[in-house]
């Protein structure tokens, strides 16, 4: 879809614009290693699509979505570490700790996380948002990425917590909640926050279920091929939500997730 591709190009450009931290050269190189690789950018695209559907400024949504993408990439750096998933390849390239060393990768993730909030908190990076709205966006992202969100979900995962729904809602769904909620804040539609939080959670759950089906782990280990039917039910439920009916771009992004298994 042409509009999605345009947004994606703008997200790539914005990531390059905002990712200019200062510090030791090797640390900066490690911080940039994941975010500047070409990716799906599904999270910032959802942020922009929600903001657009609700009447928000697309440039501001691109800035916020790019920040969420940086948070996502910091989490990937840490997830790949030997003490977590111990992965050696990501996107066809050596993982951050393989290329830069374990200690540098750990520090790069830390620095990327803190730098993201430095960028997102600067008024000059936005066109239409008030200081109050910027503060709210930072609070939402901090909560959804933190101990009761993405990081908390990772803890449940490495501890072998059996409730896959709760693990997935926190580990994957929380950051999608942030995408949808921040889209509403950008659009100055705070009355939509609870609704967007709920929809974002379900989109994140759909994303995780599709991943598990393709990787044959997680939900697939519990449900087997029945998982495909559960995915279809959740997809059909989301399609009936008003915001998906009204936004061609949101439907397209939802289809991108679902069609990976069809």
UniProtKB/Swiss-Prot annotation:
Q: Any keyword Magnesium?
A: yes
List of residues binding isopentenyl diphosphate: 40, 43, 72, 91
Show the catalytic activity.
Answer: isopentenyl diphosphate + (2E)-geranyl diphosphate = (2E,6E)-farnesyl diphosphate + diphosphate
Which one Pfam family would you cite for this protein?
polyprenyl_synt
The protein's required cofactor(s) are namely:
Mg(2+)
Positions contributing to (2E)-geranyl diphosphate binding: 90, 171-172, 208
GO cellular component labels:
cytoplasm
Q: Which UniProt keywords apply?
A: Cytoplasm, Isoprene biosynthesis, Magnesium, Metal-binding, Transferase
Any note on cofactor binding? Binds 2 Mg(2+) ions per subunit.
Q: What is its main location?
A: cytoplasm
| Gene3D superfamilies in the record | Farnesyl Diphosphate Synthase (1.10.600.10)
Describe the family membership recorded for this protein in Swiss-Prot or TrEMBL. Belongs to the FPP/GGPP synthase family.
Q: What protein does this entry describe? A: Farnesyl diphosphate synthase
Q: Which organism is it from?
A: Aquifex aeolicus (strain VF5)
Q: What is the lineage of its organism?
A: Bacteria, Pseudomonadati, Aquificota, Aquificia, Aquificales
């Amino acid at each position: 879809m042409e509009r999605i591709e345009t947004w994606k190009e703008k997200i790539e450009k914005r990531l390059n614009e905002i990712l200019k931290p200062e510090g030791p050269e090797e640390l900066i190189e490690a911080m940039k290693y994941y975010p500047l690789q070409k990716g799906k950018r599904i999270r910032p695209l959802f942020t922009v699509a929600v903001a657009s559907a609700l009447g928000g400024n697309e440039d501001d949504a691109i800035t916020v979505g790019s920040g969420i993408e940086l948070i996502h990439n910091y989490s990937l750096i840490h997830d790949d570490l030997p003490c977590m998933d111990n992965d050696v390849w990501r996107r066809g390239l050596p993982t951050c700790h393989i290329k830069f060393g374990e200690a540098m990768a750990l520090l790069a993730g830390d620095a990327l996380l803190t730098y993201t909030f430095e960028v997102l908190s600067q008024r000059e990076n936005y066109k239409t948002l008030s200081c109050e709205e910027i503060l709210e966006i930072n609070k939402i992202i901090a909560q959804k990425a933190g101990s009761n969100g993405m990081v908390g979900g990772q803890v449940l995962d490495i501890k072998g917590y059996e409730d896959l729904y709760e693990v997935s809602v926190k580990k994957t769904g929380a950051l999608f909640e942030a995408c949808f909620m921040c889209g509403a804040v950008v659009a100055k539609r705070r009355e939509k926050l609870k609704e967007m939080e709920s929809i974002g959670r379900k989109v994140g759950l759909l994303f995780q279920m599709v991943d598990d089906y393709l990787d044959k782990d997680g939900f697939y280990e519990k449900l087997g091929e029945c998982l495909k039917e559960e995915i279809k039910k959740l997809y059909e439920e989301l399609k009936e939500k008003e915001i998906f009916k009204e936004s061609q771009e949101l439907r397209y992004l939802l289809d991108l997730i679902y069609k990976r298994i069809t």
